[in-house]
Each structure stands twice: as C-alpha cells, then as structure tokens.
Design a protein with these regions (language model features):
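NTP-dependent nucleotidyl-transfer catalytic core
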Residues: 1-195
Length: 196
C-alpha cells in the first residue's frame, strides 16, 4: 500500500512511525473505525473516514466497522458541557441501520467486518467492569479538556460518562485492531489505551 495514499487527507497520526512500519510489513492489517449511532445520519466527517477505510479495504486489509450500540446508549461526552440524553435500545438500532445503509454506499459490504460492542459489554460482569477501571486514573480522565472544564465549573459529570473513554478504548483491545481511524477530535485521543 502506498504510504502517500495513507497519509493523504490526514491531519494527525498518532504513532506515525509505527503505522508506517505496519504498512510496509506487507502484513494484512485490522483497521477499525467505530461509530456510536446516536443520531439517524452520519456527518461529513464520517464520509472522510469511510473513504480512508475504503482505501485500506481496497489494499486488502480487514476493514472493521464497529457499531457502538452499547456506548451509544451512554453517549460520548467529548466536547459536551452537559450530560447527553439517554437513548433507548430501539433508537440506537434504528440509527445503526441507517448508518450501515449510508456506510455501504462507500464500503464494500461483502468485505466489511461489522461488530457491535454490545457483543462483549453485555456479557461483562460488574466485577469485570470494575477491573477495567484499573487501567486509568481519575487524574488521567480529568486531563481531558471536556471533563476538566465541566469539573472546574461544577457541572455534573456522570460516572457513566466518566467511564466512556475507557469503554471505548476497550473496544480496540477486544478487536485487536492494528490501526484505528477516526473523525478529528483531539479530545478523543484519550479514549485509546495500549494492550497489556
């Protein structure tokens, strides 16, 4: 796969040298893009990322589209100054269906691996959830701009929202993704953590 193709249209690459090493290895890579179906339609930003995922797909890599049906019910706190309204399971499923319809206008549906994070989170015990919290500290979470601002201004941050970045990072551990692509949001870089 041509390095220039991968780098084109990207603004920030975290671990650029590692990415280039993975691409030049010739190994088939698992490339993940996750979306939480919190509304009926995808955004223009999603379109850009789907095109990048398609480039990896066309180069023979595994394109993994993660539907964050579990995390959509929580709601991504990134950039929010208040708690997101909770969605029902039915709303999330309706939104997910339209997301897939829209995504497959770009991606090859036969070559796209669709996963839902409810597959693992619905099976997780409370003890497992608590054990997951050992991976990050409160101080690390408060480094996130969105949480920091809300904390300093005495605005509520629910425990569910506080766990969201950890939950989202765990998706990548479960999927064993080599590469993650996403819509530009520097606040979300805290949603990723390394496998141990």
């Amino acid at each position: 796969m041509e390095t220039n193709l991968i780098l084109s249209g990207t603004e920030t690459i975290i671990g650029k040298d590692e990415l280039l090493d993975k691409i030049s290895s010739g190994k088939k890579l698992k490339v993940k893009f996750g979306v939480d179906p919190t509304r009926p339609d995808l955004t223009f930003g999603h379109l850009v990322v789907f095109n990048k995922l398609k480039q990896f797909q066309d180069a023979g890599h595994d394109a993994i589209l993660l539907i964050g049906d579990y995390t959509a019910r929580i709601g991504d706190p990134s950039g929010r100054s208040e708690v997101r309204p909770e969605l029902t399971e039915e709303e999330v499923e309706q939104n997910a269906a339209t997301y897939l319809d829209q995504a497959f206008k770009i991606l090859d549906s036969d070559k796209t691996i669709i996963r839902r994070n409810s597959e693992w989170f619905s099976e997780m015990s409370f003890a497992d959830s608590l054990n997951l919290t050992r991976k990050m500290t409160v101080a690390q979470m408060l480094e996130r701009d969105d949480f920091s601002k809300r904390f300093k201004s005495n605005q509520p941050i629910s425990m569910v929202e506080f766990m969201y970045p950890l939950i989202q990072g765990y998706d990548s551990v479960i999927l064993e993704s080599d590469i993650e692509i996403g819509v530009r949001n520097f606040k979300k870089t805290g949603n990723f953590f390394k496998k141990e």
